[in-house]
Amino acid sequence: MLNARFLFSLLLLPSLLGAQPTKPVQKPAAPPTLDARQRPRHLTDEQLLDQVQRQTFRYFWNFGHPVSGMARERSNRSFDYGDEVVTTGGTGFGLMAIIVAAERGWITRAQAAARVSKIVNFLWKADMYHGAFPHWYDGATGHTIRFSLKDNGADIVETSFMYEGLLCARQYFTRDTPDEGNVRSKVLWLWEGVEWNWFTQGQNVLYWHWSPNNGWSMNHPLHGWNEALVTYVLAAGSPRYAIDKAVYDQGWATGPDYLNGKTYYDR
Protein backbone atom coordinates (compact mmCIF):
# COMPACT_ATOMS: atom_id res chain seq x y z
CA MET A 1 0.00 0.00 0.00
CA LEU A 2 1.15 3.55 -0.59
CA ASN A 3 2.71 5.23 2.41
CA ALA A 4 0.47 8.06 3.66
CA ARG A 5 3.37 10.23 4.75
CA PHE A 6 5.00 9.81 1.36
CA LEU A 7 1.84 10.86 -0.46
CA PHE A 8 1.46 13.85 1.82
CA SER A 9 5.04 14.88 1.03
CA LEU A 10 4.36 14.49 -2.68
CA LEU A 11 1.35 16.78 -2.50
CA LEU A 12 3.41 19.39 -0.74
CA LEU A 13 6.08 19.60 -3.41
CA PRO A 14 6.36 22.99 -5.06
CA SER A 15 5.23 23.13 -8.03
CA LEU A 16 1.13 0.44 -26.80
CA LEU A 17 3.46 -1.21 -27.60
CA GLY A 18 -0.06 -2.38 -28.34
CA ALA A 19 -3.14 -2.17 -30.50
CA GLN A 20 -3.23 0.23 -33.38
CA PRO A 21 -6.19 2.60 -33.51
CA THR A 22 -9.21 1.28 -35.36
CA LYS A 23 -9.80 4.57 -37.10
CA PRO A 24 -7.49 7.23 -38.54
CA VAL A 25 -5.86 9.42 -35.92
CA GLN A 26 -7.26 12.92 -35.83
CA LYS A 27 -4.85 15.68 -36.65
CA PRO A 28 -4.81 18.36 -33.95
CA ALA A 29 -6.63 21.52 -34.74
CA ALA A 30 -4.50 24.61 -35.10
CA PRO A 31 -4.56 26.72 -31.93
CA PRO A 32 -7.06 29.57 -32.24
CA THR A 33 -5.81 33.02 -33.08
CA LEU A 34 -6.12 35.30 -30.07
CA ASP A 35 -7.45 38.82 -30.47
CA ALA A 36 -5.93 41.10 -27.83
CA ARG A 37 -9.05 43.27 -27.97
CA GLN A 38 -11.10 40.37 -26.63
CA ARG A 39 -8.94 39.73 -23.58
CA PRO A 40 -10.79 40.13 -20.29
CA ARG A 41 -9.87 43.31 -18.45
CA HIS A 42 -10.02 44.52 -14.87
CA LEU A 43 -9.98 41.03 -13.36
CA THR A 44 -9.68 40.59 -9.63
CA ASP A 45 -6.88 38.37 -8.37
CA GLU A 46 -9.34 35.52 -7.85
CA GLN A 47 -10.81 35.94 -11.33
CA LEU A 48 -7.34 35.95 -12.86
CA LEU A 49 -6.36 32.77 -11.04
CA ASP A 50 -9.62 31.13 -12.10
CA GLN A 51 -8.99 32.14 -15.71
CA VAL A 52 -5.44 30.77 -15.70
CA GLN A 53 -6.54 27.54 -14.06
CA ARG A 54 -9.41 26.98 -16.47
CA GLN A 55 -7.30 27.78 -19.54
CA THR A 56 -4.56 25.44 -18.32
CA PHE A 57 -7.09 22.66 -18.01
CA ARG A 58 -8.52 23.39 -21.47
CA TYR A 59 -5.13 22.85 -23.10
CA PHE A 60 -4.77 19.36 -21.65
CA TRP A 61 -8.42 18.45 -22.15
CA ASN A 62 -9.14 19.81 -25.63
CA PHE A 63 -5.72 19.11 -27.12
CA GLY A 64 -5.10 15.65 -25.66
CA HIS A 65 -4.13 12.93 -28.12
CA PRO A 66 -7.30 11.21 -29.41
CA VAL A 67 -5.95 7.66 -29.00
CA SER A 68 -3.97 7.85 -25.77
CA GLY A 69 -5.39 10.92 -24.05
CA MET A 70 -1.81 11.99 -23.34
CA ALA A 71 -0.65 15.61 -23.44
CA ARG A 72 0.92 16.83 -26.65
CA GLU A 73 4.34 18.45 -26.74
CA ARG A 74 3.66 22.18 -27.05
CA SER A 75 1.29 22.73 -29.98
CA ASN A 76 3.05 20.07 -32.09
CA ARG A 77 3.59 22.79 -34.67
CA SER A 78 6.87 23.88 -33.10
CA PHE A 79 10.24 22.46 -34.12
CA ASP A 80 8.64 19.92 -36.48
CA TYR A 81 7.76 17.51 -33.66
CA GLY A 82 4.96 15.91 -35.66
CA ASP A 83 1.35 15.26 -34.77
CA GLU A 84 1.82 12.08 -32.73
CA VAL A 85 4.38 13.23 -30.14
CA VAL A 86 3.08 13.17 -26.57
CA THR A 87 5.01 13.95 -23.42
CA THR A 88 5.05 12.00 -20.17
CA GLY A 89 5.95 14.84 -17.81
CA GLY A 90 3.41 17.16 -19.38
CA THR A 91 0.76 14.48 -19.03
CA GLY A 92 1.46 14.33 -15.30
CA PHE A 93 0.72 18.05 -15.11
CA GLY A 94 -2.41 17.48 -17.18
CA LEU A 95 -3.69 14.80 -14.82
CA MET A 96 -3.56 17.28 -11.97
CA ALA A 97 -5.47 19.82 -14.06
CA ILE A 98 -8.14 17.22 -14.87
CA ILE A 99 -8.61 16.45 -11.18
CA VAL A 100 -9.02 20.17 -10.45
CA ALA A 101 -11.54 20.50 -13.28
CA ALA A 102 -13.63 17.62 -11.94
CA GLU A 103 -13.56 19.04 -8.43
CA ARG A 104 -14.60 22.49 -9.65
CA GLY A 105 -17.40 21.16 -11.85
CA TRP A 106 -15.96 22.15 -15.23
CA ILE A 107 -16.34 18.52 -16.30
CA THR A 108 -18.12 15.64 -14.60
CA ARG A 109 -16.24 13.22 -12.39
CA ALA A 110 -17.18 10.44 -14.82
CA GLN A 111 -15.65 12.35 -17.73
CA ALA A 112 -12.45 12.90 -15.77
CA ALA A 113 -12.22 9.25 -14.73
CA ALA A 114 -12.77 8.09 -18.32
CA ARG A 115 -9.93 10.28 -19.63
CA VAL A 116 -7.53 9.23 -16.88
CA SER A 117 -8.48 5.59 -17.45
CA LYS A 118 -7.65 5.98 -21.15
CA ILE A 119 -4.23 7.37 -20.23
CA VAL A 120 -3.35 4.58 -17.80
CA ASN A 121 -4.53 1.94 -20.29
CA PHE A 122 -2.12 3.45 -22.81
CA LEU A 123 0.79 3.51 -20.36
CA TRP A 124 0.08 -0.03 -19.22
CA LYS A 125 0.97 -1.33 -22.71
CA ALA A 126 3.49 1.29 -23.82
CA ASP A 127 7.29 1.02 -23.91
CA MET A 128 8.94 1.11 -20.48
CA TYR A 129 12.52 0.62 -19.32
CA HIS A 130 12.99 -0.99 -15.91
CA GLY A 131 9.56 0.44 -15.16
CA ALA A 132 10.42 4.00 -16.21
CA PHE A 133 8.87 5.98 -19.04
CA PRO A 134 10.67 7.76 -21.88
CA HIS A 135 10.35 11.52 -22.32
CA TRP A 136 8.23 11.19 -25.49
CA TYR A 137 5.85 8.59 -26.90
CA ASP A 138 4.05 8.14 -30.16
CA GLY A 139 0.56 8.79 -28.84
CA ALA A 140 -1.02 6.31 -31.25
CA THR A 141 1.30 3.31 -30.81
CA GLY A 142 3.02 3.63 -27.43
CA HIS A 143 6.46 3.40 -29.02
CA THR A 144 9.27 5.64 -27.78
CA ILE A 145 10.16 8.72 -29.80
CA ARG A 146 13.69 9.83 -29.07
CA PHE A 147 14.12 13.18 -27.35
CA SER A 148 17.70 13.61 -28.54
CA LEU A 149 20.35 11.54 -30.30
CA LYS A 150 21.08 9.27 -27.33
CA ASP A 151 17.93 9.91 -25.31
CA ASN A 152 15.67 7.12 -26.54
CA GLY A 153 14.96 5.21 -23.36
CA ALA A 154 14.18 5.85 -19.71
CA ASP A 155 13.91 9.39 -18.38
CA ILE A 156 13.36 9.18 -14.63
CA VAL A 157 12.70 12.90 -14.17
CA GLU A 158 9.86 12.92 -16.72
CA THR A 159 8.72 9.65 -15.16
CA SER A 160 8.56 11.43 -11.80
CA PHE A 161 6.45 14.26 -13.18
CA MET A 162 4.12 11.63 -14.62
CA TYR A 163 3.81 9.90 -11.26
CA GLU A 164 3.00 13.11 -9.43
CA GLY A 165 -0.19 13.13 -11.47
CA LEU A 166 -0.81 9.38 -11.48
CA LEU A 167 -0.49 8.96 -7.72
CA CYS A 168 -2.74 11.92 -7.03
CA ALA A 169 -5.28 10.47 -9.47
CA ARG A 170 -5.14 7.15 -7.65
CA GLN A 171 -5.91 8.89 -4.36
CA TYR A 172 -8.70 11.01 -5.88
CA PHE A 173 -10.64 8.36 -7.80
CA THR A 174 -11.88 6.24 -4.90
CA ARG A 175 -15.40 5.35 -6.04
CA ASP A 176 -16.60 1.90 -7.04
CA THR A 177 -16.97 2.46 -10.79
CA PRO A 178 -15.20 0.60 -13.63
CA ASP A 179 -13.10 3.59 -14.68
CA GLU A 180 -12.11 4.64 -11.17
CA GLY A 181 -11.28 1.06 -10.19
CA ASN A 182 -9.20 0.68 -13.34
CA VAL A 183 -7.24 3.84 -12.51
CA ARG A 184 -6.46 2.64 -8.99
CA SER A 185 -5.38 -0.87 -9.94
CA LYS A 186 -3.27 0.01 -12.96
CA VAL A 187 -1.56 3.00 -11.39
CA LEU A 188 -0.57 0.79 -8.45
CA TRP A 189 0.79 -1.86 -10.83
CA LEU A 190 2.78 0.73 -12.78
CA TRP A 191 4.04 2.48 -9.65
CA GLU A 192 5.27 -0.70 -7.99
CA GLY A 193 7.20 -1.64 -11.13
CA VAL A 194 9.56 1.36 -11.31
CA GLU A 195 13.05 0.11 -10.43
CA TRP A 196 14.31 3.35 -8.91
CA ASN A 197 17.34 1.78 -7.20
CA TRP A 198 18.50 0.30 -10.52
CA PHE A 199 19.04 3.83 -11.82
CA THR A 200 21.90 4.37 -9.34
CA GLN A 201 24.32 2.09 -11.23
CA GLY A 202 25.25 0.83 -7.76
CA GLN A 203 26.37 4.31 -6.69
CA ASN A 204 24.93 6.80 -4.23
CA VAL A 205 23.28 9.00 -6.85
CA LEU A 206 20.40 8.66 -9.32
CA TYR A 207 21.07 8.89 -13.06
CA TRP A 208 18.62 10.72 -15.28
CA HIS A 209 18.72 8.55 -18.43
CA TRP A 210 19.23 5.01 -19.62
CA SER A 211 18.82 3.67 -23.16
CA PRO A 212 18.69 0.08 -24.42
CA ASN A 213 20.82 1.23 -27.38
CA ASN A 214 23.18 3.64 -25.64
CA GLY A 215 23.25 2.44 -22.04
CA TRP A 216 24.35 5.14 -19.59
CA SER A 217 26.14 7.24 -22.20
CA MET A 218 24.08 10.35 -21.35
CA ASN A 219 25.90 10.19 -17.98
CA HIS A 220 23.73 12.75 -16.19
CA PRO A 221 23.72 12.28 -12.39
CA LEU A 222 20.98 14.15 -10.55
CA HIS A 223 22.43 16.67 -8.10
CA GLY A 224 20.40 19.42 -6.40
CA TRP A 225 19.03 21.96 -6.40
CA ASN A 226 16.53 21.89 -9.29
CA GLU A 227 13.13 20.55 -10.33
CA ALA A 228 14.31 16.93 -10.04
CA LEU A 229 13.87 16.80 -6.24
CA VAL A 230 10.62 14.90 -6.75
CA THR A 231 12.62 12.05 -8.31
CA TYR A 232 14.42 11.44 -5.03
CA VAL A 233 11.19 11.75 -3.03
CA LEU A 234 9.47 9.15 -5.19
CA ALA A 235 12.51 6.88 -5.25
CA ALA A 236 12.72 6.99 -1.46
CA GLY A 237 9.01 6.16 -1.15
CA SER A 238 8.96 3.24 -3.58
CA PRO A 239 7.23 0.18 -2.08
CA ARG A 240 9.56 -2.27 -3.87
CA TYR A 241 12.62 -0.51 -5.26
CA ALA A 242 13.41 2.25 -2.77
CA ILE A 243 16.79 3.98 -2.74
CA ASP A 244 18.88 4.16 0.43
CA LYS A 245 19.13 7.38 2.41
CA ALA A 246 22.78 7.66 1.35
CA VAL A 247 21.67 8.10 -2.27
CA TYR A 248 19.84 11.27 -1.28
CA ASP A 249 22.53 12.51 1.10
CA GLN A 250 25.50 11.87 -1.18
CA GLY A 251 23.75 12.28 -4.52
CA TRP A 252 21.16 15.00 -4.35
CA ALA A 253 22.10 17.01 -1.27
CA THR A 254 25.73 17.57 -2.24
CA GLY A 255 24.96 20.22 -4.85
CA PRO A 256 26.52 23.68 -4.58
CA ASP A 257 23.21 25.23 -3.51
CA TYR A 258 23.13 23.30 -0.22
CA LEU A 259 24.67 24.87 2.86
CA ASN A 260 24.97 21.67 4.87
CA GLY A 261 26.03 22.12 8.47
CA LYS A 262 25.78 25.91 8.32
CA THR A 263 23.29 28.36 9.79
CA TYR A 264 21.69 30.53 7.14
CA TYR A 265 18.43 31.54 8.82
CA ASP A 266 18.56 32.25 12.53
CA ARG A 267 14.99 33.21 13.41
Residue spans for each PLM region:
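Ser/Thr/Asn(+Pro)-rich, low-complexity disordered segments
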Residues: 20-267
